[in-house]
Amino acid sequence: MSVIEIRSYQHWISTIPKSGYLAVDCYADWCGPCKAISPLFSQLASKYASPKFVFAKVNVDEQRQIASGLGVKAMPTFVFFENGKQIDMLTGANPQALKEKVALISSKATGTGALASSSSAPVKGFASLQGCIENPQLECLNQQDDHDLKSAFNSNPSSFLESDVDEQLMIYIPFLEVVKVHSIAITPVKGETSSAPKTIKLYINQPNNLSFEDAESFTPTQVIEDIVYEQDDQPTIIPLRFVKFQRVNSLVIFIYSNVGEEETTKISRLELFGEPVGDSSKGKLQKVEA
């Protein structure tokens, strides 16, 4: 199977597999390192490509919307998807790193590797909204530099988001299009459920992140209290008042307190579920069948 050259946004949407893996080479015609490593990417595609593992290329100058949504800031950048969700990124023309990354994902695609994938906790009838998030505009106040918000959106089980000077976090999540948000899934850090969020306040359609002072003075769209985590390393699904989250272009999550009144709050993984509004999708969704 050859490398697919993405020609339009709709072509991009149709290329991302709902079930399986995707490796994307984000390049520019003027980029020397891009040209140097391009033959290797093609060789890897010839070796590993299958119906479960697709290889594609995106010209960042011609497909700016796609590049922006992927968070590409330098070339070349290689982006990897699992079941319609972005799971990893590799920046720079590093042949050995690219070989290792592709080989690892291939082992997951064929089910032969020790890290064979498991899907995230499903919300039946709805889809993960991770592909609809405008990643470059994500923001979190009071996060630790080494444990920032991006740590809660990747697939690395050892990474996590942690607050800094106290237990509170202010998370701003903008979307590439208007969505309906049905539920939030929060996974605690293994063995540290006491540091997981207990009370959260949600605010929709804010143009920017809120300050902690503003959040106290604004009326939340919904307040969720006394969150209970049955397993310390598994997602807890928190259904929202769906009628209040029908047209959402951004979501602010104010982590107000944690379960054990710990000094800092920790989140292993954060995921949103819902569906897009209208027929024009700007992000790839993975539907979870009932």
Curated annotation (Swiss-Prot):
Q: List the disulfide bonds.
A: C31-C34
One annotated GO molecular function is: protein-disulfide reductase activity
Q: What is its main location?
A: cytoplasm
What InterPro entries does the record point to?
Galactose-bd-like_sf (IPR008979), PITH_dom (IPR010400), PITH_dom_sf (IPR037047), Thioredoxin-like_sf (IPR036249), Thioredoxin_domain (IPR013766)
Is this entry keyworded Transport? yes
Q: Which GO terms describe its biological process?
A: negative regulation of transcription by RNA polymerase II; proteasome-mediated ubiquitin-dependent protein catabolic process
Q: Give all residue intervals belonging to the PITH domain.
A: 118-290
The record places domain Thioredoxin at 24-104
- Which N-terminal stretch is annotated as signal sequence? none
Q: Output the superkingdom of the source species.
A: Eukaryota
Q: Choose one Gene Ontology CC annotation of this protein and give it.
A: cytosol
Subcellular localization, as worded in the UniProt entry = Cytoplasm; Nucleus
Q: Which UniProt keywords apply?
A: Cytoplasm, Disulfide bond, Electron transport, Nucleus, Redox-active center, Transport
**Function field:** Has a role in cellular detoxification of alkyl hydroperoxide.
Q: What is this protein called?
A: Thioredoxin-like protein 1
Q: Species name for this entry?
A: Schizosaccharomyces pombe (strain 972 / ATCC 24843)
